[in-house]
């Protein structure tokens, strides 16, 4: 009985699923009346069709044989006990065993053989509880047995002699029942034992009292007890149940029953996932974009029904999300039910998430045998303009982050399959053939590969395993076998073998993971899932710059999409700004017009070089402000700005504002390096060397990681690497400084080395569809229009005047020489020869050029020349040598300049006394 109660929840859901599948099969087999409206309904797989694979223990062939041996031993013991207890033909040994059993459990000896037979059958059929539930089941069974023996002892009159106890509850029943009777009396001891018995049954079956009451109420026909079934019915009826009732009423000629519309009830916690995924929130209709967001939060209703991710429980989102739940309508005419055009065109996000409900709705319409009549709805009233009280002046309060519920959840991960057992046997056979003392002690199944842990015997070298890599690959019938010697943190060798049934990792699961949601870092991006089955996310601030490489089709573009979608769902435009460089012109097109952009998406390499140069100037300006305010990081600068600790000096026209983080994503670095290699490399090196504290980060992606694209200077200054499948070992060494990427199997399989990590981490990159990207982008664009910054892509070289003729082609060398001389404050020709690796003649010419421009003094024989330019004036002199106007050079605001500006302003204006209470400052 307890086992049947334990199967209650699962059987009920299986019955509903079977009925649903039978309904879809019946609909799919009927001929369609019109091609435009009748579609074949694809049956959805049951959510627990791979239940055995997911919950199966990772058992080897040895463990299975051991279980069979235990089962046969139990059968033998049951035969001996049955012969001795039931028939009295057990002989002396059997009689002795029967006496001991009677002495221990009394009358329970009569049913003990049956229990042993049942246990043996369960072991033979592998019908055992999950590993995490074994302790709970054993505790429940133990409590039931002890309580039953104590009850038998009490009902037998609490015998004091051992002969009487043999036919009652035995020693166990006496030890439990006698103290209860002496302490409480038999009238209280029996209810206490019955309650304990009931509690043991609940522990064994794993159900709650509420579920038991619902089962009992449904079994005896009481109304109002089957809440789970009502919830399923209400979920379907609320959206499409009235369509079903309308069709049935038209077919039978009865009047349709009117049911008041009501909101979906809040679902109680279940042990099984819902039959159909809940509808995902879709963005509200986009208002006319404006530079100042004027939409109130009340215009975006919040949907409290969160999608339940199969891979991991959902955690409440840290920001509200916008959603509108629409319900199809049926006209009250003699015609067949009308469907509006708006209903026939679902939102992009809900198309993918609520596919089962859409297919069921189409099946219901097709079953009617009539074409749906399109009903024209009256135009919706114009939205009421928000009042000034509804508009919050702070931009952070008027922007609502797109919810991660817009993304499609993935399927539950598999923990074990028959393929894993075959791989263990194949690897073990290879060790046996070559006489290697090593055994497979376990494995970790990831979404793409499975890592088998190999434990070596005493005196076995690790090289014996590595030398068998080709033989292992032959045994498992794949060439992409990767050895890990040793596994980090374990005294074992890892053999990574690709899975024949790969798992798709969805970005929605990564962003909805508990660790990701609890992390409040706005620049945290979802990477994917590692080989242990854990979701991997990492902050761009900690990278702080990332180099991504991989061949065509390896998953590089999918990672770029995951990065951008992660930033859109976690960061507001005031927090993170983006510069997107897309030389291919098609990869980043969906993100055109998002409010996070500093400039429109850049597709021309020349403009990309100008944008990188603009980033260098922005970095220098930020550092000057940080120096002026005595802070070392952009976080501290923004914190002091918001708290009011940093104030503009009196008389200064400068207004300090919080700086947003800037992420520059270059989709294809090779195209830029072919057009302007020197300028691109110089800008990248300068940014990656010192832009981390200024809040500027680079993400460089390329499908050709050769030495002419990823140069030594770029590699040195970009600490984090993400390598997808490469075509050769050379490319893997260029991106990772080691091999391994050439062994990856593509389609998102990657090796990730964050800053400071010694060995790469193998992950399966997250995937996001075009529909999901569009849903997130639409919601962001609906709330705010991008505010572009002028001059980001303007070519500064075209505006500069002509370089002096005497400099010629030596401008770059002259700039390096000037920077070296000014910073070291030593004008020595021999130093230029050593530092710049040039000859004496060129070094002397550079020194003469610096003398004519007032950088150094005249020659003094063998002594070093006097340096006339101070280090504070370096930026200005470099600006002048490039042919630009000195007034355009970046300058730091000194107190002398502020005093001069204050004096000039005081001469032309009237001084007003500051009075904060009156708003005058």
Curated annotation (Swiss-Prot):
Q: Which InterPro entries match?
A: FtsK/SpoIIIE/SftA, FtsK_4TM, FtsK_alpha, FtsK_dom, Ftsk_gamma, P-loop_NTPase, WH-like_DNA-bd_sf, WH_DNA-bd_sf
Residues bound to ATP are 553-558
Instruction: Specify the superkingdom.
Output: Bacteria
Query: Where do Pro residues bias regions lie?
Result: 271-290
Q: Which GO CC annotations does the UniProt entry carry?
A: plasma membrane
Give me the Cytoplasmic side stretches, as residue ranges: 226-921
How this chain sits in the membrane, per its record, is: Multi-pass membrane protein
Gene Ontology terms, MF aspect: ATP binding; DNA binding
What is the annotated role of this protein in its UniProt record? Essential cell division protein that coordinates cell division and chromosome segregation. The N-terminus is involved in assembly of the cell-division machinery. The C-terminus functions as a DNA motor that moves dsDNA in an ATP-dependent manner towards the dif recombination site, which is located within the replication terminus region. Required for activation of the Xer recombinase, allowing activation of chromosome unlinking by recombination.
Q: Subunit info?
A: Homohexamer. Forms a ring that surrounds DNA.
What information about domains appears in the record's comments?
Answer: Consists of an N-terminal domain, which is sufficient for the localization to the septal ring and is required for cell division, followed by a linker domain, and a C-terminal domain, which forms the translocation motor involved in chromosome segregation. The C-terminal domain can be further subdivided into alpha, beta and gamma subdomains. The alpha and beta subdomains form the DNA pump, and the gamma subdomain is a regulatory subdomain.
Supply the name of the protein.
DNA translocase FtsK
Species: Corynebacterium glutamicum (strain ATCC 13032 / DSM 20300 / JCM 1318 / BCRC 11384 / CCUG 27702 / LMG 3730 / NBRC 12168 / NCIMB 10025 / NRRL B-2784 / 534)
Lineage of the native species? Bacteria, Bacillati, Actinomycetota, Actinomycetes, Mycobacteriales
